[in-house]
Amino acid sequence: MSSGAVLTSQEYITHHLSNLKVGEGFWAVHLDSLGWSVFLGLVFLTIFRSVAKKATSGVPGKLQCAVEMVVGFVDDSVKSTFHGKNALIAPLSLTIFVWILLMNSMDWVPVDLLPHLIHWVTGMPLGDIYMKPVPTADPNITFGLALGVFILIIYYSIKVKGVGGFMKELTTQPFGHWSLYPVNFILETVTMLARPLSLALRLFGNLYAGELIFLLIATIGVFQLPVHFLWAAFHLLVIPLQAFIFMMLTIVYLSLAHEDH
């Protein structure tokens, strides 16, 4: 892209929806998505570790209160949904919820803020700066998260039920007759594969659409501000809701994996 060219609305949107990447095709690495997701993960770990080390039984500070509210909320969600015995589920759910919430929250960052900051610091032409700061608007990130959940589902299904029990679950339901076992296997396999697929696409679709609408609003010009703030206010619901849905479905799927029929 020519650094001095004036962008049309379509070029402006396309530019902001393009990742900073190395490589091409399947082997392309999106450096911005990867960098922001790692950074926000470290922010989560640093804050929660710091609060845990400084926790007091006396009057807690505001940050400790906020962390305790989040931990209590996630713990209650796990207790009401997960009926197996696994000490990993609660911390896993907490990590998923807070990490995705932080990544989603990057959607509130004004679309031109980071490119202009990079331009101001480095002097790079704006047309050469690619920075997509919302990791969950990148399907590579959401599919990576969903793949991790899928691996845990398979692992605990085999660990709790054994290989034989897991295969029996795939072949003997919903139809009980032996002649329909192949049909059962196909149906159950499709159902199992649909779980991570739906997790990834739901999160990606909602955040990508949100980012796209912010960009469309930005093309209006100076008249964008009232609409921009209205959409940002609506995102106060969407951003935590998508993190909550991903967490709850993960808990449900892992609970099903722990059920030994």
Swiss-Prot record:
Transmembrane segments: 28-48, 89-109, 140-160, 203-223, 229-249
The organism's taxonomic lineage, starting at the top: Bacteria, Pseudomonadati, Pseudomonadota, Gammaproteobacteria, Alteromonadales
Pfam families associated with the record: ATP-synt_A (PF00119)
Name of the molecule in the record: ATP synthase subunit a
Subcellular location: Cell inner membrane
Keyword set includes NADP: no
InterPro entries: ATP_syn_F0_a_bact/chloroplast (IPR045082), ATP_synth_F0_asu (IPR000568), ATP_synth_F0_asu_AS (IPR023011), F0_ATP_A_sf (IPR035908)
Gene Ontology process terms (BP): proton motive force-driven plasma membrane ATP synthesis
Name of the coding gene: atpB
Subunit-level organization: F-type ATPases have 2 components, CF(1) - the catalytic core - and CF(0) - the membrane proton channel. CF(1) has five subunits: alpha(3), beta(3), gamma(1), delta(1), epsilon(1). CF(0) has three main subunits: a(1), b(2) and c(9-12). The alpha and beta chains form an alternating ring which encloses part of the gamma chain. CF(1) is attached to CF(0) by a central stalk formed by the gamma and epsilon chains, while a peripheral stalk is formed by the delta and b chains.
Family: Belongs to the ATPase A chain family.
Biological role: Key component of the proton channel; it plays a direct role in the translocation of protons across the membrane.
A cellular component annotation (GO) from this entry: proton-transporting ATP synthase complex
An example molecular function term from Gene Ontology annotations: proton-transporting ATP synthase activity, rotational mechanism
Domain of life: Bacteria
Organism in which the protein naturally occurs: Colwellia psychrerythraea (strain 34H / ATCC BAA-681) (Vibrio psychroerythus)
Membrane topology, as annotated: Multi-pass membrane protein
Keyword field: ATP synthesis, Cell inner membrane, Cell membrane, CF(0), Hydrogen ion transport, Ion transport, Membrane, Transmembrane, Transmembrane helix, Transport
Keyword Oxidoreductase in record: no
Principal place of residence: membrane
